[in-house]
């Protein structure tokens, strides 16, 4: 097989003093952090779609990249060539996992029959590639949003035949994910929303997608899939409003359909930005609700109202995220997937490496800062002190349901309560955070 990235053997850790742009400066996979290898903490994955499927096009311009597998030709032959390049990239980047949508790896074809045939062929190819390279599948998913049939959604479509086509894709992608040893299966409702309420029945669409998710859970248990099911929240784009708006919205949906113990969330940083939240907020909310699963590590531009999918470069932002994850015990089946793409002007094929190397170094630095925060314990102590009253007799009686509203009012009056405001010490804690970051 002819090498595509023929000027590079493999990316390795060379340390912070190295001037080699094709080396890791902070990500040392074997370095121990809190007693665990850095690679095991971070569980990096590269994505198939932005890295190998995007051609550099945007709403105002055609594709700017010269990718041999994106040229005219036999679709399956080109898909196999793309797989060759993808796994060469995964190996040379030294990344342990990858992620895909069904039509990232396989031509959709002109019919459902062709789709099923092509995906079966490419599942065989991926299985062989994983075996020979040692690269594993973090998660698979089905693209039920790009084709025109999904213009009005997939599970929320007004036509049950479109719903059925989407069900076939998810059924097939779940089976492929299980066969390939995928540790999770993701459901992103790219067009599960609306553009106008003038032609939308909200109750009907909610019932449809609720039943769809129940079917997915039923299939998981029927087949014995051991991975985690994940929903990926996003507030809008491409629709005006999406039903999986943010983590809290997804939790409400899961509770409505009795799925809160079955499905967790895959949180993307850029989607948090679009929802008006910090990345930190969405991670902390998911952990608090018991539905944290995995992360799409990227960044958005707060000055732009769309999904820019840039590589993460903020150690400060991601240290807070990794702090929450470490406090919660770390990843189980999830990991850090780089749902990020090089810029349209980044036309050198090695720009793919520069983007991922910088992101991996950023997350490694963030992990080390988060580990200092955990070990030092000052933030934990400050928060514990702030809520200490809830561990006392009054707080415990309230939480345990031993006091009614009337009884509590009588207690407050009888004890002549006159609580005094206590400083939240935000500025002090922000200064402490800077010391963790910069020494």
Curated annotation (Swiss-Prot):
* Compartments, record wording: Cytoplasm
**Catalytic activity line of the entry:** alpha-D-xylose = alpha-D-xylulofuranose
Q: What is its main location?
A: cytoplasm
Extract one GO molecular function annotation from the record.
magnesium ion binding
Q: Name one GO biological process term.
A: D-xylose metabolic process
Cofactor binding note: Binds 2 magnesium ions per subunit.
Per UniProt, Mg(2+) 1 binds at 232, 268, 296, 339
Annotated Mg(2+) 2 binding lies at: 268, 271, 307, 309
| PANTHER family referenced in this protein's UniProt entry, alphabetically | PTHR48408, XYLOSE ISOMERASE
Q: What is this protein called?
A: Xylose isomerase
Taxonomy-wise, where does this protein's organism fall, top ranks first? Bacteria, Pseudomonadati, Pseudomonadota, Gammaproteobacteria, Enterobacterales
**What would be the name of the gene that encodes this protein?**
xylA
């Amino acid at each position: 097989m002819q090498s595509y990235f023929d000027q590079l053997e493999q990316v390795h850790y060379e340390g912070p003093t190295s001037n080699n742009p094709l080396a890791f400066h902070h990500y040392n996979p074997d370095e121990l952090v809190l007693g665990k290898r850095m690679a095991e903490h971070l569980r990096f994955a590269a994505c198939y779609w932005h890295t190998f499927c995007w051609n550099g096009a945007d709403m105002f311009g055609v594709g700017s990249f010269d990718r041999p597998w994106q040229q005219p030709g036999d679709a399956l032959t080109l898909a196999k060539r793309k797989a060759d390049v993808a796994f060469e990239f995964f190996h040379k980047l030294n990344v342990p996992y990858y992620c895909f949508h069904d039509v990232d790896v396989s031509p959709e074809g002109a019919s459902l029959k062709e789709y099923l045939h092509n995906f079966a062929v490419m599942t065989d190819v991926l299985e062989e590639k994983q075996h020979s390279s040692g690269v594993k599948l973090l998660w698979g998913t089905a693209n039920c949003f790009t084709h025109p049939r999904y213009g009005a959604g997939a599970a929320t479509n007004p036509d049950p035949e479109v719903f059925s086509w989407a069900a076939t894709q998810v059924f097939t992608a779940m089976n492929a994910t299980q066969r390939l040893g995928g540790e999770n299966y993701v459901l992103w409702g790219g067009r599960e929303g609306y553009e106008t309420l003038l032609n939308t029945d909200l109750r009907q669409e909610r019932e449809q997608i609720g039943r769809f998710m129940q079917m997915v859970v039923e299939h998981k248990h029927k087949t014995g899939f051991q991975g985690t099911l994940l929903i990926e929240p996003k507030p809008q784009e491409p629709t005006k409003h999406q039903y999986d708006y943010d983590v809290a919205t997804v939790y409400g949906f899961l509770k409505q359909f009795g799925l809160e113990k079955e499905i967790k969330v895959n949180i993307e940083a850029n989607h948090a930005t679009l929802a008006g939240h910090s990345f930190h907020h969405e991670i902390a909310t998911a952990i608090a609700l018991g539905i944290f699963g995995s992360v799409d590590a990227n960044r958005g531009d707060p000055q732009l109202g769309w999904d820019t999918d840039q590589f993460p470069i903020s150690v400060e932002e991601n240290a807070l995220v990794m702090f929450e994850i470490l406090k919660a015990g770390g990843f189980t089946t999830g990991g850090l997937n780089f749902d990020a793409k090089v810029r349209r002007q980044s036309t050198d094929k090695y720009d793919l490496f520069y983007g991922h190397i910088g992101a991996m170094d950023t997350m490694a630095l963030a992990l080390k800062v988060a580990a200092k925060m955990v070990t030092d314990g000052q933030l934990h102590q400050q928060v514990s002190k702030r809520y200490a009253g809830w561990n006392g007799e009054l707080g415990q009686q309230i939480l345990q349901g031993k006091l009614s509203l009337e009884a509590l009012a009588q207690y407050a009056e009888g004890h002549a309560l006159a609580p005094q405001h206590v400083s939240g010490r935000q500025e002090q804690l922000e200064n402490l955070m800077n010391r963790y970051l910069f020494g």
